[in-house]
Amino acid sequence: MPGIVLIGAQWGDEGKGKATDLIGTKVDYVARFNGGNNAGHSVVVGDESYALHLLPSGIINPNLTPVIGNGVVVDPEVLFEEIDGLESRGIDCSHLKVSEAAHIIAPYHRTLDKVTERFLGKHKIGTTGRGIGPAYADKINRVGIRVHDLFNADHLHDKVEASLHQKNQMLVKLYNRRPIDVDQTTEELLKLGERLKPYVANTGLILNKALDEGKTVLFEGAQATMLDVDHGTYPFVTSSNPTAGGACTGTGVGPTKITRVIGVSKAYVTRVGEGPFPTELLDESGEWLRQQGHEFGVTTGRPRRCGWFDAVVNRYASQVNGLTDIVLTKLDVLTGLKEIPICVAYDVDGERHDDMPTDQAAFAAAKPIYETMPGWDEDISDCHSFDELPATCQAYVKRLEELSGCRISAIGTGPQRDHVIQINSLVD
């Protein structure tokens, strides 16, 4: 009954897609449990690269069942674009299962997301504009539309009417926009529902039955710990729970069925959008990391903010998620540096903090306290065991492990699928 949770331990873009694909060859199901198509990730198989936003990374593997859980907000138009794109390249998506209880991102959610960000001006959150936040807001306000609502015209019309009642008032009176037509929106959603229906299932039942039968389920988180709406750098966060606890609420599987929690961390740190970032590099070092690591968003194309490894963040992620293992990615990007700084603590108003401040004002004021490790020049992409790595590279990894408080069980040494060193098994 192995239930394995895979989450990001930083601010996202850690390489979870590659880690999922690595583990996915040994599991029976891969289930996404949070977020929406704001979560871009790339999977490289041989010479082929697949950019995914909504589909689980495991969709590439024909021998497992990919699942979109109830905690995900689903934009049907984006889902069909991804399915069509993969099938045009010979990838069969017919085995996909979508939770009947997942909430839908409707066209008006995207509209609201964009106009709200413009209205907020300098106070904007820095969303992707894809309707994620408004869809989750509707879920909490109990006016959301779920997948199973798309199959009954009268019921759906009532749901759309209820959802748009307040939104149209806001659009007209606050944002000076035209109201959204209820009938037209209902018709659009009904058509989307017709195509979605073959994929729809009671995914909670499917996953629990699989675990009871001794099959292995990988729970794939989108975004990351520091973007969690409860545990991240609020308010500069996503609208869901990308932490390990979200795997349970986002799929309908109980916590006693989770046997392992794996966090993915880059060998440095990146962030997209607004919000505090203590180790951010605004100089040529940051630009060097950005270019060497190809740090541009899969979803938005935006350049990512780059900084040195933050051990305080990783310790916090280990604590919040109960990490059992860390997958360290993009270690190869650091090749060529003479010295590599590691943030081991923060200076907040002259006082040392070894742990994450809960006060976001304090976190925004935090200055990194660094220790420096020697770098290496050797190409590590052909290394297949930890002992083959340069001695200074090994020392860097061991220090990150010590500071994070969790063992590093796999290391990414390059962009290809086989550019990885496995130290400990990730699947029991």
UniProtKB/Swiss-Prot annotation:
Mg(2+) binds at residues 13, 40. Its main location: cytoplasm. GO terms for molecular function: adenylosuccinate synthase activity; GTP binding; magnesium ion binding. Binds 1 Mg(2+) ion per subunit. The keyword Nucleotide-binding applies. Pathway: Purine metabolism; AMP biosynthesis via de novo pathway; AMP from IMP: step 1/2. Homodimer. This is Adenylosuccinate synthetase. It comes from Bifidobacterium longum (strain DJO10A).
